[in-house]
Amino acid sequence: PYLRRTEYMIAYNVRAFPVEEAKTILKSNPRLLSLNEMYLVAVTYPRESKEFKEVFDIAARLYPDDPIALINSAATDLEGGNFVAALERLERVKNDPRAWNNMGVSYAKAGDLAKATEFLKKAADNGDPMAATNLKELKKEIKNQ
């Protein structure tokens, strides 16, 4: 008998959620949202708000291997004064140059000035102007001790 072969091609478009709808979905079923949609929800809240941090925490939990999700969530930890949590997240992406400035700042705030200098220098050498500024400030602080 002859064998038949049937090939199918399925294409679909995923509808993007408007921000207000995404806010509701974030509470009920955040897995339906992309990382970008979560970011768009987060920026509707004040940076220092609980909701802003919560969105990035959810993103880091749902996208645990995404460097941007981890870096953003660590940044909210850093801004909130939770340097240990920031470092825990940043350690997972320590080879990503985008994380180096925040790692340096987190180590400085946690009191590990040697590691802070190491990461700020790496970031500055990689062309991060904020890291260069932070490194200068850290060197002044070390000199004044």
Regions found by a protein language model. Name each.
Residues P1-Q145:
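N-terminal targeting segments with Sec-dependent signals, encompassing both cleavable signal peptides
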